[in-house]
From Swiss-Prot:
Keywords (A to Z) from UniProt: Amino-acid biosynthesis, Histidine biosynthesis, Hydrolase, Methionine biosynthesis, Multifunctional enzyme, NADP, One-carbon metabolism, Oxidoreductase, Purine biosynthesis
Gene designation: folD2
Residues binding NADP(+), per UniProt: G165, R166, G167, T192, V233
Organism: Rhodococcus jostii (strain RHA1)
GO MF entry, a single one: methenyltetrahydrofolate cyclohydrolase activity
Family membership: Belongs to the tetrahydrofolate dehydrogenase/cyclohydrolase family.
Chain's role: Catalyzes the oxidation of 5,10-methylenetetrahydrofolate to 5,10-methenyltetrahydrofolate and then the hydrolysis of 5,10-methenyltetrahydrofolate to 10-formyltetrahydrofolate.
Known catalytic reactions: (6R)-5,10-methylene-5,6,7,8-tetrahydrofolate + NADP(+) = (6R)-5,10-methenyltetrahydrofolate + NADPH; (6R)-5,10-methenyltetrahydrofolate + H2O = (6R)-10-formyltetrahydrofolate + H(+)
Name the UniProt record assigns to this protein: Bifunctional protein FolD 2
InterPro entries listed in its UniProt record: Aminoacid_DH-like_N_sf, NAD(P)-bd_dom_sf, THF_DH/CycHdrlase, THF_DH/CycHdrlase_cat_dom, THF_DH/CycHdrlase_NAD-bd_dom
Length: 286
């Protein structure tokens, strides 16, 4: 068996085409969505991520709002920048790029973001709304995972989903999405200290690997025909590596590559969250 590849780049391009139409319709009503980014310091990886997000904005017609700050900035200066974006009517939604320099309090910065402008969908208020089943901006990577599975018609309802990883961006929130009544999956949350991880993963119809451990999920751990999504990213001497070993492709029914699988959809749904908020603003104006 050779796995069907879940092509995140092609799926992202489909989303971008849809967003172009929606942004054009908003502009016809006098509303131009704007994505803001707050980048502190000169970390090459963070700078590349931010640059990619603004390149995406240009493709769909969203205005870019950049706030690039020196690495030695104080918490007070960062807070003032966040407050400015909260109040800026041109900024529909924004993100604070992580990690921040050590002198800054990441949690305090993220909590200061206006929850309605939370483009990442990771503000504590919005995660709380997700727990309660209320409408809120959804976390981008979990949303991208769900969309990719649906795009390739991978059965979700009634599926047993095993998530490996307990981070706030993927591992913790994704179970909340999969167990909604619109998905009706059963979720097991595992991590690197799970006893007999292989036995847990082998029970899965869908495996989401998000632990940040290179090659953690191997072919002998995967049920034949299962869908495997590789979300983990680790920097190694050989470059960036995902959590899924290469031999999984011979066992899985569906496999998201890394890079090129879920990553492009994370960025696509960042823009989607911004456009959706702009549409809510337009609807409120009548």
């Amino acid at each position: 068996m050779t796995a069907t590849i879940l092509d995140g780049k092609a799926t992202r391009d489909e989303i971008f085409e849809d967003l172009k139409v929606r942004v054009s319709a908003l502009k016809d009503r006098g509303i131009t969505p704007g994505l803001g980014t707050v980048l502190v310091g000169d970390d090459p990886g963070s700078a590349a991520y931010v640059r990619g997000k603004h390149n995406d904005c240009a493709k769909v017609g969203i205005t870019s709002i950049r706030r690039d700050l020196p690495g030695d900035i104080t918490q007070e200066k960062l807070d003032a920048t966040i407050d400015e974006l909260n109040a800026n009517p041109d900024c529909t939604g924004y993100i604070v790029q992580l990690p921040l320099p050590k002198q800054l309090d990441e949690n305090a910065a993220l909590e200061r973001i206006d929850p309605d402008k939370d483009a990442d969908g990771l503000h504590p208020v919005n995660l709380g709304r997700l727990v309660l089943g209320k409408k809120a901006p959804l976390p981008c990577t979990p949303r991208g995972i769900l969309h990719l599975l649906r795009r390739y018609e991978v059965p979700i309802e009634g599926a047993h989903v095993v998530v490996v990883g307990r981070g706030v961006t993927v591992g913790r929130p994704i179970g909340l999405l999969f167990t909604r009544r619109s998905e009706n999956a059963t979720v097991t949350l595992c991590h690197t200290r799970t006893r007999d991880l292989g036995a847990e993963v082998r029970r899965a119809d869908i495996v989401i690997a998000a632990a940040g451990v290179p090659g953690l999920i191997t072919a002998d751990m995967v049920k034949p025909g299962a869908a495997v999504l590789d979300v983990g990213v680790s920097r190694t001497a050989d470059g960036l590596r995902g959590d899924v070993a290469a031999d999984v492709a011979e066992v899985a029914g569906f496999l998201s590559p890394n890079p090129g699988g879920v990553g492009p959809l994370t960025r696509a749904f960042l823009l989607t969250n911004v456009v959706e908020r702009a549409e809510r603003v337009a609807a409120s104006l009548g």
